[in-house]
Curated annotation (Swiss-Prot):
Its EC number is 3.5.1.2. Homotetramer. This is Glutaminase. The lineage of its organism: Bacteria, Pseudomonadati, Pseudomonadota, Gammaproteobacteria, Enterobacterales. It comes from Shigella dysenteriae serotype 1 (strain Sd197). The gene is glsA. Belongs to the glutaminase family. It is an enzyme of class 3 (hydrolase). It catalyses: L-glutamine + H2O = L-glutamate + NH4(+).
Length: 308
């Protein structure tokens, strides 16, 4: 039986999960992320009627990393037709690491989905073609959805990622060789790394993503962010591809559409009810927040929520 939400439930879940801290590893392949305090743990929930619940380090900002891939897809959906987007990127889970080159080579430069690095780079390449200032536009979108006007990029993280971008550059050039990348590689990479370097808190992420629980409508903006069908499609992609190669395990344990980032954040959606954001910087072997997944697992068990 489903139970009512309150902050005490969230605080109790964090207490249960905190012993897991120390078992994962903070992302160290991006030097600017390697210095993050691995003991941080937070959760925030925003409901479709605007209620906010939080516990732990829910108001501390962190690098959202690949969570931004959902936002770049949303922006692309507002500027490109369905046919234009999906002829350049697929909708299937990859089953491979998020920065794999092998699968991309075998599949003629068409990424499996927009939530692996190759797919997100294609989406950023598309945005470069239709937006005069892609980085500024993303800030406008995030600030509008969250209702917070000072959200910004962590330029130190963006620079650190660009200085260690050989693999992502290789992905972009490989797609360019197949004709699926149209703009200057360096320019698009810079935009991509800035998107990943957005600094947001769990509270801000939950408010930003509640439109996916609310049929495409943000709770404080009159104009829909996406159509109800697009919201459903994005949730479906998150369910199949948002946790990289661990999507099946996550579906088994948590049962919600979600998107993770190597900054330790995860955003999960309960359709028609709420958006959930968790943060714990220590990652498992697949690059997902180890304690964050455990928090979501306990939450869905206690609340009786699942899309399955």
């Amino acid at each position: 039986m489903a139970v009512a939400m309150d902050n005490a439930i969230l605080e109790n879940i964090l207490r249960q999960v905190r012993p897991l801290i120390g078992q994962g590893k903070v992302a160290d392949y991006i030097p600017a992320l390697a210095t993050v305090d691995g003991s941080r743990l937070g959760i925030a929930i925003c409901t479709v009627d605007g209620q906010l619940f939080q516990a732990g380090d829910a108001q501390e900002r962190f690098s959202i990393q690949s969570i931004s891939k959902v936002l770049s897809l949303v922006v692309a959906m507002r500027h490109y037709s369905e046919e234009e987007i999906w002829q350049r990127v697929g909708k299937d889970p990859s089953g491979s690491p998020f920065n794999s080159l092998v699968q991309l080579e075998m599949e003629q430069g068409i990424p499996r989905n927009p939530f692996i690095n190759a797919g997100a780079l294609v989406v950023c390449d598309m945005l470069q073609g239709r937006l005069s200032a892609p980085r500024q536009r993303m800030l406008e979108v995030v600030r509008g959805l969250s209702g917070v006007s000072d959200i910004s990029y962590d330029t130190v993280v963006a620079r650190s990622e660009f200085e260690h971008s050989a693999r992502n550059a290789a992905i972009a050039w490989l797609m360019k060789s197949f004709g699926n990348f149209h703009h200057d590689v360096t320019t698009v990479l810079q935009n991509y790394f800035h998107y990943c370097a957005l600094k947001m808190s769990c509270v801000e992420l939950a408010r930003t993503f509640v439109f996916l629980a609310n049929q495409g409508k943000a709770i404080h903006i009159d104009e829909p962010v996406v159509t109800p069908m697009q919201a459903r499609q994005i949730n479906a992609l998150m369910a199949t591809s948002g946790i990289y190669q661990n999507a099946g395990e996550f579906a088994w344990r948590v049962g919600l559409p979600a998107k993770s980032g190597v900054g330790g954040g995860i955003v999960a959606i309960v359709p028609h009810e709420m958006a959930i954001a968790v943060w714990s910087p220590e990652l498992d072997d697949a690059g997902n927040s180890l304690a964050g997944i455990a928090v979501l697992e306990q939450l869905t068990k206690q609340l009786g929520r699942s899309v399955y």
